[in-house]
A protein has these predicted regions:
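Catalytic-site beta-strand/loop segments enriched in glycine and acidic/polar residues
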Residues: 146-181, 185
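Membrane-interfacial amphipathic helices and adjacent loop/beta segments
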Residues: 43-64, 102-145, 151
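A cross-family acyltransferase "interaction/gating" segment
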Residues: 172-233
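Structural motif
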Residues: 80-82, 104, 161-163
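Membrane-anchoring hydrophobic helices of lipid-metabolizing enzymes
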Residues: 2-99, 122-124, 239, 246-263
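Amphipathic coiled-coil/heptad-repeat helices and related helical stalk/stem segments
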Residues: 65, 87, 143-147, 174-175
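Solvent-exposed loop/turn segments at secondary-structure junctions
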Residues: 88, 110, 167-170
């Protein structure tokens, strides 16, 4: 083969390699539509995921200094557990059923699987997405109704859980919904992060989803409570949102450092 043909073949291989991720993503989107529309498939997957999460939870040894939501409950603390998208998969274990009244889950079809897994763990779900203040789209997604429902659960003396950042929005940037819940309920937000020494980060996903593996070390970090005054104005709400963003980042970095031996 002459040099020109070799160059052409090389370029074709490079184009093919570049196209594969996009083709794979497109294929997954087509398959996913059928999965989320099938109640039977969703139920089976939910049970498999729930079993996997229990395996991860029970086979990872907590490192020294690891926190616990159960310990906070025993001390009489109540509030809103907050985590980032991509690090929320262990929520059913971190926020134990019986103590956690409800977790907000997106109204999207994809989130139906998350809701099923939470319900298998004994945690009720309220469907909605919390966006920024005066976000009409958030209201249309049931965010306002879900926030009212979460407030009622908090009024009963139970914990609730929310994913702080907005689905398919800017990752690791807290939305205003969770801050609003803290203001109207009078209950603080607790930044929560979980990490294991054996894990896989899906770099191509929008939220850098973390898959935790069993048989390693685990750490939970529960940050200091973040209070929002009932009369907080727009500037105070934004300050609380930015504070929560920073504290969730800090908790996530701390949990990773603890299991990686860098604490």
């Amino acid at each position: 083969m002459d040099e020109g043909n070799q160059d052409g073949a090389r370029e074709e291989r490079q184009r093919s390699r570049r196209a594969r991720p996009g083709a794979a993503k497109s294929l997954w989107k087509r398959i996913r539509v059928h999965i989320v529309r099938s109640p039977v498939t969703t139920a089976i997957l939910a049970r498999l995921i729930h079993a996997w999460l229990r395996l991860v939870w029970t086979t990872n040894r907590p490192v020294s200094g690891s926190d616990s939501v159960i310990d906070r409950i025993a001390r009489g603390e109540r509030g809103i557990g907050a985590a980032w998208h991509g690090q929320h998969l262990m929520f059913p274990c971190i926020m134990p059923g019986g103590h956690t009244g409800a977790v907000m889950v997106s109204r999207s079809a994809d989130a139906e699987l998350n809701a099923r897994v939470l319900e298998l763990a004994g945690i009720d779900t309220l469907r909605g997405s919390g966006g920024r203040a005066n976000d009409r789209k958030a209201a249309e997604r049931g965010g306002a109704r879900a926030l009212i429902g979460l407030k009622r659960v908090l009024d009963e003396g139970k914990w609730v859980g929310m994913i702080a950042d907005i689905p398919h929005g800017t990752p690791r940037d807290a939305g205003m919904g969770i801050v609003t819940l803290a203001r109207i309920s009078g209950k603080p937000v607790y930044p929560v992060a979980y990490q294991t020494s054996r894990r896989k980060v899906l770099e191509r996903t929008w939220d850098k989803t973390t898959i935790n593996w069993p048989f390693g070390r685990a750490a939970i970090v529960v940050g200091d409570p973040i209070h929002v005054a009932a009369d907080a104005d727009e500037a105070a709400m934004e300050a609380a949102r930015l504070h929560l963003t920073a504290e969730l980042d800090r908790a996530s970095a701390r949990a990773a450092a603890m299991v990686d031996g860098n604490a």
